[in-house]
């Protein structure tokens, strides 16, 4: 097959299907003359699931505000902290919405529409290759197109060979990677959480300090457990999920019927607060979203990952005007570390000390709820 003639040089090539990647492309293109190309990464796998969305997501940028009406969302008014012992529990319920629950797939689809509406060139190639890079740009093949972008934005996992070529950080450490195991439940017959639901969760499932949730969604629910990857040899995700079902039943949140389809559970590995361990800057490349490890320690996905897009777009716009682009990309990390960096940390570091207080001190129950759902500091 004859090679396609190279396209005119692109300014930025954004890779990855995560909403953060689409948002980066949107912000780079808006009100500029930059040529911005967005490409999904072949074989990138991000299973659809329910995700908790901080209301702050919609105020990150004016272009995101309309999504509040377009997305099918379930409001959450607080958290209900359950334990293995039904007599030990606490709850904080706010008068206002503290979080939303929606479909990851729908958020991604709306962000893709937003990118197309902003004239981002969107590609879904069967093949993607980064061939080489030098002091003026990067040679890449996106489907049938040969591109030479000045800078790359990576928002998803690349093959190892291309990973090394770009000088991307080494694989995440085991203490950063957490296994998130979930099962979707269709319909609302599983539990009645009322018209102003609080979200049931465990902070210490089976005395493992693993977290678990029952997420109320627009058309169903989702059971989920999270554990450090280094604990997989000791605690099987399927066993933790089954134990969580038992805890919910003993706390009379779930009824004895119908049977939960645990055999349909799916798992993904998330680098929680991984951004704190890496620079997020490689050769002519910035990392955003999952590639940069911008999940919060509380497993929050959409808001913190998309927040990274704002800093990346701003850094790239400034760097493209400088004679030495690589040097101009490095302020990226310094920009987000004192704001988004604090948000990513979450309350986990002090959880062993906080846990007894959560069940007997209403002030601490409130603060931990706001820390998990809104990113506020527990210590004030």
Stretch-by-stretch model annotation:
Residues 114-251:
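Predominantly flavin-linked oxidoreductase catalytic cores and closely associated redox partners
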Residues 4-20:
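Beta1/beta-strand and adjacent pyrophosphate-binding region of the FAD-binding site
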Residues 42-82:
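N-terminal FAD cofactor-binding segment of flavoenzymes
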Residues 20, 44, 159:
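Conserved Rossmann-like nucleotide-cofactor binding loop
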Residues 93-113, 232-238:
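Short beta-strand to alpha-helix junction loop
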């Amino acid at each position: 097959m004859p090679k396609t003639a190279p396209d005119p040089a692109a300014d930025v090539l954004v890779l990855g299907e995560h909403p953060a990647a689409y948002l980066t492309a949107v912000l780079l293109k808006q009100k500029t003359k930059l040529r911005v190309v967005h490409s999904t990464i072949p074989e990138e796998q991000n299973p659809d699931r329910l995700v908790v969305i901080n209301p702050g997501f919609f105020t990150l940028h004016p272009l995101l505000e309309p999504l509040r009406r377009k997305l099918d969302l379930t409001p959450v008014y607080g958290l209900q902290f359950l334990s293995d012992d039904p007599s030990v529990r606490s709850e904080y319920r706010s008068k206002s919405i503290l979080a939303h629950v929606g479909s990851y797939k729908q958020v991604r689809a709306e962000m893709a529409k937003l990118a197309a509406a902003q004239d981002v060139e969107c590609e879904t190639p069967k093949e993607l290759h980064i061939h080489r890079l030098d002091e003026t740009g990067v040679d890449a093949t996106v489907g049938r197109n040969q591109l030479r972008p000045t800078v790359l934005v990576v928002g998803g996992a690349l093959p190892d060979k291309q990973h090394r070529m770009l000088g991307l950080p080494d694989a995440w450490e085991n203490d950063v990677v957490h296994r998130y195991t979930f099962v979707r439940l269709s319909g609302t017959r599983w539990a009645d959480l009322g018209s102003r639901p609080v979200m049931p969760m465990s902070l210490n499932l089976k005395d493992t300090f693993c977290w678990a949730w029952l997420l109320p969604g627009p058309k169903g629910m989702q059971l989920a457990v999270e554990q450090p990857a280094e604990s997989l040899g000791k605690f099987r995700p399927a066993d933790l999920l089954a134990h969580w079902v038992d805890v919910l039943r003993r706390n009379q949140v779930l009824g004895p019927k119908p049977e939960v389809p645990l055999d349909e559970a799916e798992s993904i590995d998330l680098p929680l607060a991984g951004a704190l361990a890496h620079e997020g800057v490689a050769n002519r490349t910035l990392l955003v979203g999952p590639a940069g490890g911008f999940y919060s320690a509380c497993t929050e996905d959409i808001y913190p990952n998309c927040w990274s897009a704002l800093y990346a777009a701003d850094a790239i716009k400034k760097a493209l005007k400088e004679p030495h682009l690589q040097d101009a990309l490095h302020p990226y990390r310094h920009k987000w570390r004192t704001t988004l960096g604090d948000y990513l940390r979450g309350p986990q570091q002090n959880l062993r000390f906080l846990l007894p207080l959560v069940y007997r001190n209403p002030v601490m129950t409130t603060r931990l709820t706001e820390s998990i759902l809104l990113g506020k500091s527990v210590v004030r």
